[in-house]
Amino acid sequence: MTLVVGRITQGGIRVDSDSKITDPNIASNRNSVFSGLLKTIILNPNISVSYAGGVDTAQKAIEELYKLEKFEIGKVKGLLLEIHSENDCETDFLIASLENQPLLYKISENKIDVSNSFQWIGDIKGFNLFQKEFFPNLKSQDPKHISTVHSNAFDKVIESDQIESVGGFHITAHRTQFGIEYLFKMSLSMGRSETMTLKQGTNIIPWGNAETGTFSSCYLKSDNPYKPAIGIHFPIGNFGTLYYPRVNRKVIFYKDVNGFEFAEKVKSDYGIKIIGMIKNGEYMTRI
């Protein structure tokens, strides 16, 4: 299964998804975070498609979408509903669309439901945990606050060991001035409790290491909204993963590369410039 949650607030739109796949016939899918797949596919700056359920059906749907001459919302909805129905409704879809207004379309149970506020698909237990983490922490209707609480609640679901079908990486697609794009961010999980007092100006961040159980990742996005892709660099381990669904549905690995080298190799191999924040010695540098 998986969990995908979409939300619209005052013209903004975001869709959060995990990357875990849980095919019981593939042992590695249960054991490795890197065996996951990108669950939210940005087709162009106006449309993204997310899925939950049967992976094979979802991959077939993505293949068929890329055969379309033009990504029009009517054709995208019709194609996904047809594939959903033909495969016994085993795979649900969530479409984020920027039309005259931001809209979320949910394809499930042989029908399409549209909302201008909220939709979700996937694991009901995961969604219930999301709601449990979201509502008690919602203190205002400020869009930035709502987005932060939403993101933190989704992180809690991924981190929980009670939801077996949800896990892996937390991928976000959101609205920017250029349309729907992947969110670039830095994630740092300390192996032990650390207290940091930051002074004004430049600060050195104690990254820790593998021995202390620290896990860090730098999420980088394509700078071209018409070539949507997302890369994740792991400073502790010096490797990167690229998700570029138009070219390859699976994760693309780059070993023994620092953040700069990872970005350079992606540009050389696929003509994509990925941007975001990377570790540069003891500092963070935007590329």
Sequence positions of predicted segments:
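N-terminal nucleophile
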Residues: 1-287
